[in-house]
């Protein structure tokens, strides 16, 4: 039987990632092609998924992201596919239980180079939250504009919660000082898992298996204990209105949130590199 898709349905299908289209094609023999019966989106950019599609997206994106952890789109898809039905609602409820969290849900602020003046942040005192954020972005060579838009979470409010978590991720890097090297990302994901309970952050810790032996030892002896201890005892970071904290002292904010700054990973890696270089020279 041949299928004739309207241009609108072709557009819907084109928005689906390759892994999800594979899942759709596998199920075509047992039921009608799901794109033909896709529900109406709940918000701009929303792609509704069936349970089979969501499971396929979760498994496919998790496996592919393990082998290529720099594919932010795969990590984002895995995060959305595994956040429902429970975990993203728990995070939303944590915001609803906090006066600041409720304000964030009401105001719906977004974090990007359009909403934050990077030029102004670079003029703040060196210990200000905004200056630490801008300096971290400059040092790591990243931009606040690289976060994908949420599209696989059905509830519109929960979709914003996931978007907010995603856009705040670099602030977590900035206040902890962890770099975006794989070792630093694994440490931060462990911290986020203890603080948010989002499954994707926990799954990301499997990337520790891809680290070098010395890096794995550092993770298990230094950064995993720090991440789990601080993630559990710290306040819910999803409730931090970062836009209102930019001129505060980063040390003061860390103390208020209950976060101890970890050992400087870049300095540890630099010292290790220098030690190896000295050994080769002798």
Curated annotation (Swiss-Prot):
One of its GO terms (cellular component) is extrinsic component of mitochondrial inner membrane. It is a peripheral membrane protein. It is found in: Mitochondrion inner membrane. It comes from the Eukaryota. Its EC number is 4.1.1.130. Lyase that catalyzes the C1-decarboxylation of 4-hydroxy-3-methoxy-5-(all-trans-polyprenyl)benzoic acid into 2-methoxy-6-(all-trans-polyprenyl)phenol during ubiquinone biosynthesis. HAMAP family: Coq4. This is Ubiquinone biosynthesis protein coq4, mitochondrial. Component of a multi-subunit COQ enzyme complex, composed of at least coq3, coq4, coq5, coq6, coq7 and coq9. Keywords: Lyase, Membrane, Metal-binding, Mitochondrion, Mitochondrion inner membrane, Ubiquinone biosynthesis, Zinc. Disulfide bonds: none annotated.
